[in-house]
Amino acid sequence: MTAQLIDGNALSRQLRAEVAQRATALKARGTTPGLAVVLVGDNPASQVYVRNKVKACEDAGFHSVLEKYDASMTEAELLARVEALNNDPSIHGILVQLPLPAHIDDHKVIETISPLKDVDGFHVASAGALMVGEVGFKACTPYGCMKMLESIGMKDLRGKHAVVIGRSNIVGKPMAMMLLAANATVTICHSGTADLAAMTRQADIVVAAVGKRNVLTADMCKPGAVVIDVGMNRNDEGKLCGDVDFDGVKEVAGFITPVPGGVGPMTITMLLVNTMEAAERAAG
């Protein structure tokens, strides 16, 4: 049995088309969705991510602002820029690209973003809303993973055991909360887990999000499981790969996301969805 692919590019195209329609409708009422992207320093990977985000905004008919600053920018200067964007009515979403230079406190910057414009879903208010089931912006990567599950008919996960490998604030923790909200029984595994394979072999759904190659191999996978690979790594030939041993696991799993072309495009798509929702809320 070879697993069916969950195509993140195809699902993204569908969802982005829906966002573009919503943007057109909102613009007809006099409001253009606006996203500000702030980049500090010249990290090559960050530059690529930022470029892709700005292009996706423009393709959806959004107003986008890209602010690039030298790595020598002070924390106080960056916080002042974020406050200015908080007060700009044409901007509905603010994204500060991480990582920031070492002298700037990521947490302080994220907490300065207005929760009403926190389209990355990283603010403590957004995380708290997710925890208690209130309305708030969901972190884009796990939100995209949930949409991928929905696309294969897995919206209500009652009776399903989901294992999340990774406990980051950006993916692992919010992923677990979203799976829990969908009625899954959730296990979170990490570097302190004694027997990872014993956990994953019981899992109907595995989300791998640690940034380490081959963290999930075929012998660790339950036949027919759904495997979502959030990882972004390079193999020995320098090619992009995920956290999952794709060639091995696809012979055991029922569904699997590829890398590239899986979770990656969905992350940007859900950023657009969040920005669209922020603009609609602001417009009333």
Curated annotation (Swiss-Prot):
Segments traversing the membrane: none
Pathway in which this enzyme or protein is active:
One-carbon metabolism; tetrahydrofolate interconversion
Per the UniProt entry, the Enzyme Commission number(s) are 1.5.1.5, 3.5.4.9
Recorded GO MF terms: methenyltetrahydrofolate cyclohydrolase activity; methylenetetrahydrofolate dehydrogenase (NADP+) activity
Q: Name one GO biological process term.
A: methionine biosynthetic process
The UniProt keywords, alphabetically, are: Amino-acid biosynthesis, Histidine biosynthesis, Hydrolase, Methionine biosynthesis, Multifunctional enzyme, NADP, One-carbon metabolism, Oxidoreductase, Purine biosynthesis
- Record bears the keyword Cell inner membrane: no
Residues that coordinate or bind NADP(+): 166-168, 191
InterPro entries hit by this protein: Aminoacid_DH-like_N_sf, NAD(P)-bd_dom_sf, THF_DH/CycHdrlase, THF_DH/CycHdrlase_cat_dom, THF_DH/CycHdrlase_CS, THF_DH/CycHdrlase_NAD-bd_dom
The function of this protein is: Catalyzes the oxidation of 5,10-methylenetetrahydrofolate to 5,10-methenyltetrahydrofolate and then the hydrolysis of 5,10-methenyltetrahydrofolate to 10-formyltetrahydrofolate.
Q: What is this protein called?
A: Bifunctional protein FolD
This protein's species is Delftia acidovorans (strain DSM 14801 / SPH-1)
Encoding gene (name):
folD
